[in-house]
Amino acid sequence: TTYRSDVYNPDSRKPEVQYGDTLEGDLSRRDFTVNAMALRVPDMEFVDPFAGANDLAKGVLRTPVDPRQSFDDDPLRMMRAVRFVAQLGFTIEARTAEAISDMSSRLNIVSAERIRDELQKMLLSERPRKGVEALVDSGLAQYVLPEIPALRLEIDEHHRHKDVFEHTMMVLERAIALETDENGAVPAPDLTLRLAAL
């Protein structure tokens, strides 16, 4: 097997592909520890240098290397973290969450198409509200859906106990409820409906 150890230019997401010589080095360049495990064949040796199995069992997202280096290499990984919160119900480990907040502006070098793909996957997941909340809390939303964080500043004149953001999240949840009936899902998550709710 050929192992990779890419080198990134800080102003671009496109790596200069280089080949490494160890499986551990290859795994260190993965997005999160839960994706940095391997099975060495034919011996069937489980390789988990970053305790990804433990993080998977706990539902925790952490980067195999320093999160700042990981997100500097590929800023889309920050969006992927938010998607995993929504899709898998994971939580983001504190150091990783702090790096996302500090580096959210790095999304500017990622193509709109790649961001769109992650956003759509997040919105079509089982817990899009959790994903939207993670987008807002991390600061990523200001680069992806800038209208959404501003809703926290607005108070609904009729329901003063909740801000417009909370009402919007309730509308999103109601829209999702419309996707099901007594027979189950009808027929699948509806991206247009969920976007309209936002």
Spell out what each predicted region is.
Residues 1-198:
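Catalytic cores of the polymerase beta-like nucleotidyltransferase superfamily
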